[in-house]
A protein has these predicted regions:
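Conserved active-site segments centered on acidic
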Residues: 1-71
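Short glycine-rich anion-binding loops that position phosphate/pyrophosphate groups of nucleotides
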Residues: 16, 86-89
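A short, aliphatic-rich alpha-helical micro-motif
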Residues: 74-75
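Conserved acidic residues
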Residues: 79
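Redox-cofactor binding/interface segments in oxidoreductases and associated redox assembly factors
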Residues: 83-84, 103
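Phosphate-binding/catalytic loops
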Residues: 89-156
Length: 156
């Protein structure tokens, strides 16, 4: 049985909202199964305050996350890359190498318009959709590990 946890990298363009929310959720529900990080192809240099706020509402603290470039992870031991870019007009980053790849598109809440409450609700909606997707991913991975005695991403 493989003792090393698979390394999951969650990518989007700016690494300011979606990828951090996804990283926080996946760490929260499956930190025992995966080492989780996030990065972007064109990092914004900050984590959006509304992303921090809506994650705190569900008991997940991402306030110490930092915006990172995907280059920091090249040549590393990444086993799975999950892209979370949502719009067809976005240049979703491609991570080179032999990795498991998933794309789960989510609207970018950083582009939300309206009142403060409307913008906050957009962040909450994206967070709640991400929570469902990443909880399901974690549950499937946990079931596989229990049944097969190894992580699915280490099942080569």
């Amino acid at each position: 049985m493989e003792n090393t946890k698979p390394n999951v990298l969650i990518l989007c363009t700016g690494n300011s909202c979606r990828s951090h929310m996804a990283e926080g959720i996946l760490r929260h529900v499956a930190g025992d199964l995966f080492d989780v990080n996030s990065a972007g192809s064109n990092p914004a240099g900050y984590v959006h305050p509304l992303a921090i706020q809506v994650m705190k509402e569900i008991g997940i603290d991402i306030s110490r996350h930092t915006s990172k470039h995907m280059k920091e992870f090249l040549g590393g031991n990444i086993t799975t890359v999950i892209t979370v870019c949502g719009n067809a007009d976005q240049a979703c980053p491609m991570f080179p190498g032999q990795v498991n790849r998933y794309h789960w598109g989510f609207e970018d809440p950083a582009h939300a318009k309206g009142t403060d409450e409307e913008m906050l609700n957009t962040f909450r909606q994206v967070r709640d959709r991400m929570k469902l997707v990443f909880e399901a991913y974690a549950a499937g991975s946990r079931e596989f590990a229990t049944t097969h005695g190894k992580h699915p991403n280490n099942a080569a």
